Every structure is written in C-alpha cells, then in structure tokens.
C-alpha cells in the first residue's frame, strides 16, 4: 500500500514557500475568476530591509495586501510549548502582529472568518521577533490594509527546511478564498470607520 507523503523538505523555504503559494493561488484564481485586479510581486531583500517590498508598494499602489510567507514552526525539540505558535500540520498561519507590522484588524477578522466558513485549518500567531514584507507594504502610500499568511516551516533559513503539505494547501485555499471575498465594498470597509 502506497503512503501519501505529507511533509516535504528543501532549501530555504523562507520565502520560496510563499512564492509557490502565490503562483498556485494565481493559477486557480485565473481559472475560476475573482472580482479583483490582482498583482503578484516576488520581492527581494526582505531579510535586509524589505527593499523590494518598499519599491513594489510605491509602484503597485495596492488597495490591500496579502503577504505570503514561510514563517518559523515552533514545534521543534527544545522549544517551550508555551511559546509555540506555529506547528507543522496545524494549518496556515494568520499573523496578527510582529515587531514590524500589525495586521489590519478587519482584514485579520475577515481572514479568520473566511477560513472558518471554508473549513480551512489555521493558526493565529503573534511573533515577538522577525518581520515580513508587510513591514514596508502596510506603510506605503496612505497606508495599506495588510495581512500575512504563512506556511509554518522548520529550519527556515537552512538547507533542509521542512513543511507540511497540508499547511501549504491550506495557505493556497485561504489565499484564493480571501482574494475572492475582497471586492471593492469589502476593501473599502477595511479602512472606512465612519458612516
């Protein structure tokens, strides 16, 4: 009997995992349709100052941003269970906060509701260290509602990173479902607080 592989390994999944999710999500959205003008950006130098994201934010002038990332899985031996937020097989991570960016609260709530409604497994995370391209993108222009969706990954900057393919698929599904739900009215509701 053939067993299905649920874990994969490879070099430097941060941020190759996010790029792969973006490609798969865009393929699906192009085939099945959506209400938006979508722009994909594969940026460079996130680890040394989000340089690519800074210029991308200026060039794209986005109304809303979904950052796709390969964040750390905290389920490795020796890591305190009380500090563990991301685990392989626990679903896509929805990041609420890190030292460089705070998720738009309405977009975070929409991501969580979208995942719940679609039965997509997810993990809410708050990181005490690190950051993503959301650091630059959420500050571009007049400010951009942003959310980080991540595929939890062990040993993210090593030659042998490990991820769970179920988390990967959950990230693709949530990215697609969230993009579909973000029509003009939904995007405007992310930043308009007064009647």
At which residue positions do the language-model features occur?
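A short glycine/serine-rich beta->alpha loop
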Residues: 7-13, 97, 162
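Acidic, glycine-rich active-site loops and adjacent beta-strand->loop/helix elements
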Residues: 42-48, 70-72, 128, 153-155
């Amino acid at each position: 009997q053939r067993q299905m592989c649920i874990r994969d390994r490879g070099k430097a999944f941060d941020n190759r995992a996010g790029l792969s999710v973006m490609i798969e999500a865009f393929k699906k959205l192009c085939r099945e349709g959506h209400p938006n003008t979508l722009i994909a950006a594969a940026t460079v130098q996130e680890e040394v100052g989000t340089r690519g994201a800074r210029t991308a934010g200026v060039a794209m002038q986005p109304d809303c941003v979904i950052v796709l990332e390969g964040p750390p899985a905290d389920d490795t031996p020796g890591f305190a269970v009380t500090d563990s937020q991301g685990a392989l097989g626990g679903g896509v991570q929805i990041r609420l906060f890190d030292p460089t960016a705070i998720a738009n609260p309405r977009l975070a709530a929409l991501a969580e509701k979208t995942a719940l409604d679609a039965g997509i497994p997810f993990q809410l995370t708050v990181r005490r260290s690190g950051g993503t391209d959301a650091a630059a993108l959420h500050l571009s222009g007049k400010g951009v509602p942003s959310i980080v969706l991540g595929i939890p990954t062990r040993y993210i900057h090593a030659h042998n990173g490990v991820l769970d393919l179920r988390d990967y698929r959950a990230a693709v599904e949530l990215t697609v479902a969230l993009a579909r739900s973000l029509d003009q009215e939904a995007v405007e509701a992310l930043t308009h607080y007064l009647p």
